[in-house]
From Swiss-Prot:
Record's subcellular location: Cytoplasm
Entry keyword Nucleotide-binding: yes
Cofactor note: Binds 1 Mg(2+) ion per subunit.
This protein's UniProt keywords: Cytoplasm, GTP-binding, Ligase, Magnesium, Metal-binding, Nucleotide-binding, Purine biosynthesis
Residues annotated to bind Mg(2+): D12, G39
Subunit-structure text: Homodimer.
NCBIfam families: PRK01117.1, purA
Residues binding IMP, per UniProt: D12, E13, G14, K15, N37, A38, G39, H40, T134, R148, N230, T245, R309
Pathway membership, UniProt: Purine metabolism; AMP biosynthesis via de novo pathway; AMP from IMP: step 1/2
Keyword Lyase part of the UniProt annotation: no
Enzyme class: ligase
Protein name as it appears in the record: Adenylosuccinate synthetase
């Protein structure tokens, strides 16, 4: 059994909390895409654990965790995050954490060129806007992967006698091409190579052939949960390109990022914030640059875990959710942070776009169109009631249930979970047929 948790908007929907809720039922939690450019916080026993690259299944002592071949890995950050989790009392993590030998490596010069590329792009754009990169080197690493010049984990940990010499040669060649592209920039290649040589032995016990790992687990009928990173609207193909990440963040990326066939997938859970947020630049049709947006930002504490950047806020966009559902094939939804809407007298929901008076059929791929659309809203009554102490779905205020029903009816997918607060206990479950 392979079930998948995916973000349906622009990230920060609260995927980690659903994974944390479900993880006790699973034998394996796997990451299939991205790197340490995304983040979420899980609270267990009053302790906050921040996850960026590592699977959040580590909070379950009985769960194995895999970083798949579709993920890109900055090794110093990998060990830094692991050590921070261990310092907070997370035990036996090293024996339950595995890395695909086919995953690509992020180097410090990738991070440097990430920032140089951002400056270059913002200088060339007419409006001076940035893509909004986190500066973690993710994009440049996927770029070298696509150009077939990147280095993978197996290149680093190989025990073949000529392996290190070949690694060093490829590293220098890769650095040289980056410096030719962006001009000479300060980088201590000898220090980084020496550091990675030390990492070889420390990293080796974590490394597995992830294809063998996954297919053995499937044949043994292990229960596997795939933890998506980012969200569909940041997908390299289906997101608001170019204001996207550099990987496939939808269901397609799960298959290629773990090496499993579509027939292995059972359930696909779409995580949806009860309103909409995004970090960085790019069109955002339902954004509210007004009191409502400020209120959502303040009550929702909308700051990024990875970057600390303030998130832009707006009303729930059902055009986005329907588009995301079409591509990902969600079988049920988790609506998060419903409690943030508790004090709103009225709540707006975007249900369609139009341009020059003509209604659009679906979410447009052209950002020149997207930036000009008019949004049609439906106004629903609020519930003006604190729902954070409610423990059963049936006890939600009628207007809150009506809000959720409106979402279900619009996208044609049942809501199975509802988040009503930050704690792991603040998640209501609704039976779905």
């Amino acid at each position: 059994m392979v079930n998948v948790v995916l973000g349906s908007q622009w990230g920060d929907e609260g995927k980690g909390k659903l994974v944390d809720l479900l993880v006790s039922k699973y034998d394996i939690v796997a990451r299939s895409a991205g790197g340490n450019n995304a983040g979420h916080t899980i609270v267990v026993g009053g302790i906050k654990y921040d996850f960026h690259m590592l699977p959040s299944g580590l909070v379950n002592p009985n769960c194995q965790n895999l970083i798949g071949n579709g993920v890109v890995i900055h090794v110093p950050s990998f060990f830094g995050e692991l050590e921070q989790l261990e310092a907070k009392g997370l035990r036996d993590a090293r024996g339950r954490l595995f890395i695909s030998s086919r995953a690509h490596l992020v180097f410090d010069f990738h991070q440097r060129t990430d920032k140089l590329r951002e400056l270059e792009l913002s200088g060339k754009s007419k409006d001076g806007k940035n893509i909004g990169t986190t500066g973690k080197g993710i994009g440049p690493t996927y770029s070298t992967k696509a150009s077939r010049s990147g280095l993978r984990v197996h290149h680093l940990v190989s025990e073949q006698p000529e392996a290190w010499a070949e690694f060093e040669t490829k590293y220098r060649r890769l650095l040289e091409t980056r410096q030719q592209r962006y001009g000479p920039f300060e980088h201590d290649a000898e220090e980084e190579l020496a550091r990675y040589r030390r990492y070889r032995e420390e990293l080796r016990p974590f490394v597995v052939d992830s294809v063998v790992f996954m297919h053995n687990a499937i044949q043994q009928k292990k229960k596997i949960l795939v933890e998506g990173a980012n969200a569909l609207m940041l997908d390299i193909d289906f997101g608001t390109y170019p204001y996207v990440t550099s990987s496939s963040t939808g269901i397609g990326g799960v298959l290629t990022g773990l090496g499993i066939p579509p027939r292995c997938i059972d359930e696909i859970y779409g995580v949806v914030k009860a309103y909409t947020t995004r970090v960085g630049e790019g069109p955002f049709p339902t954004e509210q640059l007004n009191e409502a947006g400020d209120k959502l930002q303040t009550i929702g504490a909308e700051y990024g875990v990875t970057t600390g950047r303030k998130r832009r806020c707006g009303w729930l966009d059902l055009v986005v959710l329907k588009y995301s559902t079409l591509i990902n094939g969600f079988t049920s939804l988790n609506i998060t942070k419903l409690d943030v809407l508790d004090t709103f007298k009225e709540i707006k929901v975007g249900i369609s776009y139009s341009l020059n008076g003509k209604k659009l059929d679906l979410f447009p791929e052209d950002l020149l169109v997207l930036s000009k659309v008019d949004v049609e809203y439906v106004t629903l009554p609020g519930w003006d009631e604190d729902i954070t102490k409610i423990s059963r779905y049936e006890d939600l205020p009628e207007n809150a249930k009506s809000y959720l029903k409106f979402i279900e009816d619009f996208v044609g997918v049942p809501v199975e979970w509802v988040g009503t607060g930050p704690g792991r206990e603040s998640m209501l479950h609704k039976e779905v047929s």
